[in-house]
Design a protein with these regions (language model features):
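Terminal beta-strand-rich extracellular "head" domains
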Residues: 78-98
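Subunit-assembly interface segments of extracellular/virion macromolecular structures
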Residues: 42-44, 49-83, 118, 123-134
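Beta-sandwich interaction modules
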Residues: 37, 44-51, 97-108
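Ser/Thr- and Asn-enriched, surface-exposed coil loops between beta-strands
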Residues: 1-4, 41, 110
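Low-complexity intrinsically disordered segments
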Residues: 94-134
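Surface-exposed loop/edge segments in extracytoplasmic proteins
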Residues: 28-34, 70-73, 86-89
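N-terminal assembly/attachment segments of tailed bacteriophage virion structural proteins
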Residues: 1-29, 54-58, 65-69
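Glycine-rich, low-complexity segments
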Residues: 11-49, 130-134
Length: 134
């Protein structure tokens, strides 16, 4: 809209600040949660995918758990693509007793895929994603 409606009266001399987000758009607000359990150590298991036309960049916070022997692994991943190739960096890695897997990414058809090769069977994946539109 083009008007501002106040909940209460404003007195003379008061300062009123109006911030407009008209130039900004929030698409798919919030953090996407994707959780899964991987029962094998097969290479390149897809743990998340998204339409490459919808999103250009995704930041992930990943937590891997192997509860039966108290092993935990967390890290952040920043991923971006140009519709042909995927660029990805992993950082802020915290390993408690074990490295539970390695990450990779690719484009398959219209999807960008985040993949994991776990080092142990029965690895739980908790993934949180912040997506930025294309």
């Amino acid at each position: 809209g083009t008007s501002v409606v106040l909940d209460s009266a404003v007195s003379a001399g008061n300062i009123l600040e109006v911030v407009s987000l008209a130039a900004a758009a929030v698409e798919n607000p919030g953090v996407l949660a994707v959780d899964s359990d991987l029962t094998s150590t097969d290479s390149g298991q897809v743990i998340h995918s998204f339409d490459r036309a919808a999103f250009r960049t995704v930041k992930y916070i990943v937590q891997l758990e192997h509860d039966s022997d108290n092993k935990y692994h967390s890290e952040e991943i920043l991923l971006s693509h140009n519709n042909t190739i995927v660029g990805m960096t992993t950082y802020a890695q915290v390993l408690l007793d074990s490295n539970l897997g390695t990450f990779d990414a690719d484009i398959s058809g219209t999807d960008v895929r985040l993949k994991l090769t776990p080092t142990k069977t029965n690895t739980s994946v908790k993934l949180r994603a912040i997506r930025v539109g294309a």
